[in-house]
Amino acid sequence: MILFLQIKTKTNFQEEKIMGLFSKLFKGPEIDMEKSDANAKKMRELFDQAVENGDDYRLIFGYTEDVNWFNYGFVHGSKTKIGNLIVGWNEDSQTIVVVPTVPDLSGRGEPTYYRRSEILKAYRNKYPTDAFVIYPNKKGYIGINAYDWLDDEKLYVYVSQEEELAAFTDFFMKRFATK
């Protein structure tokens, strides 16, 4: 009887080990929070360099997609350009500031300000991509895509932002989007 219990315990341990392995495979990659926190700190530094009173803004990472379609007879396809963005928002002034950057956060561009009182319209587009769309005027727009976390470090900033994204979405939908 004791021998049977020892074998059963060993079998249960092996089953748990195998199930743990499968659950990790199906769960997907785990977020490296140390790397994510370091990148969030770099985002803050770049944003504060670019934006006066940058500390007054909360931040998320976002990106834009520019898709160009081509048709060369039998060859059809598309080419997508990704633009990385540090997106800051201030609830009191109802302002969104977008600062272009690169995936490794080694540099930044100049900020663009979108004040609620000065834009033509803003809305959340659910299809074909989940994007926050802002039209500052009739001639142009920006579509900001944002997710909790994206794993491809060659294309996107590596940062986990579930809580921040929820706060930005709430601000955008309740205080910034036009009806």
Where are the regions that the model predicts?
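Acidic/proline-rich low-complexity IDRs
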Residues: 2-4, 20, 84-86, 149, ...
